[in-house]
């Protein structure tokens, strides 16, 4: 196959929409992706795309499409087939109104997966031989990224495009992520006599206030979310235990280790200053952010594709965490780029403009065709 763009090669919007509808209509929360993996495997086979089923656990698999020479993968397109759980199990499927298509996973990221699959379908139906690019459709991103971690244990490639929703803006920077557990202990008492106890929830609220005040005062800023707050035990008592889970998203240039140390010092100071209060902090999940130089040769190729398709080139940072963090930690340079807007993901109003899904498929296709020389990670 020629590895330069062929004007006769183009995506088929109707086929792409049918694929996206099928993907959205299959419920595939993290850990329960068997149905969608089976469907996508059949779709790839029917369209002439040979794939490898990579085992993640007993019943879950990644799907990996590689060129004939597996050692020649210079760029891998990566998408996750799982979603968060549905807000409404009776009403999560595909719907459309005008150019807008809605449903669980439309933005995050079944539209991106469908666009990637369509691009690869065009590649094989026109020439039969893939350029030095791969496609990895993984599971588990919304929980522990176990699909991406398994992928990186067996395969190696220098570059990736991860199809998270960026509104088609190329993200060369990626926020880091810190999952934080805070725990406070108080003194249990009868609920009608709170003065005899120490309410662990009240002390947690005071601790959270100090933590969030510190976070918002940081010069580069940290995006924080108090994800969960729970008091124990239940019943008619003053709770003597409280846990809070926080998601912290850090600017790409932030030092995760510095933030950890300062949070530990803050909690230690609160613990020492409050009579009877026991405060505890633990970091459950740490993912470093990163930034890719726009001067890298492959990034310049992507910029040329944007110019060819008359798309604005305005690189930004991706401010969530994703499989991109996992790939980066494994030595890959991941560019985050896909259809849809991050602000609609994980909401009951999740949607994407279908015209943008078509645009994504065309961009992925043209970018894949432009890859005709090896690219290695800068030392």
Predicted feature residues:
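A structural signal for isolated positions on well-ordered beta-strands in alpha/beta enzyme cores
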Residues: 76, 134-136, 280
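Acidic-glycine-rich active-site phosphate/pyrophosphate-binding loop
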Residues: 82-97, 172-183, 301-304
